[in-house]
Amino acid sequence: MTTIAIIGLGNMGKGLAKRLAGKTDLVLASRDHAAATAFAATLPAGAVVLDQASAIAGADIVVLALPFEAALEAAGNPALKSKIVVDISNPVKADFSGLAIGHTTSAAEQLQAAAPDAKVVKAFNTIFAGLFDLPAAQTAAVPAFIAGNDEAAVAAVVELAVLAGFAVEKTGGIDAARLLEPLGMLNIRFGYGLGQGTGIAPNWIKLAA
């Protein structure tokens, strides 16, 4: 069974852990070990709580469920060599007025540069944390947009997304994150800035062959 390490237990990390619990070998790591242990105890199948270095070392897939700057710092860990690393971040400005980087780069590409021997895959950045609390049947048509350069790594993250109860849209290489992160920012604007709430998600509708 694949071992998935979730680094960071904010709303996104906890939401993904809830969806994956009992479906894979799940390892959690957080700065607050006691809080992580208490959260793991609430999961139906439980989860192993380790320090970040140990969690990464034993994982097949490492989900950096962290804000961009923290994810970039974590990407410098040499233990990520040869690992599949999932970047779920949107590099938003501190005041949420827009993205701090973009056009010619992306958060995912910055992480790949910081961890050149890892296989970075962008995913879940257009999904609000609250959707993880819905029954999986309600999110089965909600796509996780996925971008990455390594085909095997992308395939593994596709499986992870489906396991977590979402549909999948593959968008190409890691440079596609330059498009996905503005899409994530647009979703944030709709949800918070324009009052639509967080029970929303972008999707592509095929109207004709």
Language-model-derived ranges and their functions:
Residues P143-A209:
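Active-site-lining helix/loop region of Rossmann-like oxidoreductase modules
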Residues M1-T42:
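NAD(P)+-binding Rossmann beta1-loop-alpha1 motif at the extreme N-terminus of oxidoreductases
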Residues G15, R19, A114, L160:
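Rossmann-fold NAD(P)-dependent oxidoreductase module
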Residues V49, K119-F124, E169-G172:
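General beta-strand structural signal in soluble alpha/beta enzymes
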Residues S89-A136:
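Rossmann-fold NAD(P)-binding glycine/threonine-rich loop
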Residues A65-L66, I88, A123, A147:
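Short, well-ordered coil/turn residues at beta-beta hairpins
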